[in-house]
């Protein structure tokens, strides 16, 4: 279940957009004998590394503390918030897992002309801005959509994604339909 957050003043770490109360609640449920503040401090340190988020990602996966329960996803806390600002920009939708803003979604108006192209250009510009390093090191995936179907002839419409380590847009495309009917038996 995903909770839609409408609180305009969440207990937010403004340097990272981590939801402090949500992180602490989830962390203490997953790690009853560990201190949430220690892990938060370690994550914030790693988010400032110049490694495109690798150190933070490894901490998520390999820490002795369980930040996300990958084996039992129902043990995690899922939340989303619309238009949560970060420094000089505001993603349309932010998805949180255990208080961590790991997914950002930009939704463009269909048939808005250059909506996806303009968003791609803004994304690249933000990515290159050192002020946004922590945010890009934290967000694991970006999604962009103009709610239009994939079209080979128009490469600026459809649904796109970008991983945290690169501002390159990748497209979600429909796979070719394969005929997997076995050949008739040989006589």
Where are these regions (language model features)?
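An alpha-helical interface "stripe"
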Residues: 1-187
């Amino acid at each position: 279940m995903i909770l839609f957050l409408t609180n305009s003043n969440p207990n937010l770490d403004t340097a990272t957009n981590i939801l402090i109360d949500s992180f602490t609640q989830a962390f203490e449920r997953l790690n009853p004998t560990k201190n949430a503040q220690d892990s938060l401090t370690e994550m914030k340190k790693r988010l400032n590394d110049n490694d495109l988020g690798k150190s933070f990602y490894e901490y998520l996966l390999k820490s002795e503390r369980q930040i996300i329960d990958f084996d039992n996803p129902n043990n995690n806390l899922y939340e989303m918030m619309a238009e949560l600002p970060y420094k000089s920009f505001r993603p349309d939708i932010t998805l949180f897992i255990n208080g961590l803003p790991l997914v950002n979604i930009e939704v463009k108006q269909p048939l808005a002309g250059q909506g996806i192209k303009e968003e791609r250009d803004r994304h690249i510009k933000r990515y290159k801005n050192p002020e946004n390093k922590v945010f890009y090191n934290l967000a694991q995936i970006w999604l962009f959509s103009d709610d239009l179907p994939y079209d080979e002839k128009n490469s600026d419409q459809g649904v796109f994604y970008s991983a945290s380590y690169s501002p390159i847009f990748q497209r979600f495309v429909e796979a070719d339909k394969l005929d997997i009917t076995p050949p008739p038996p040989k006589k």
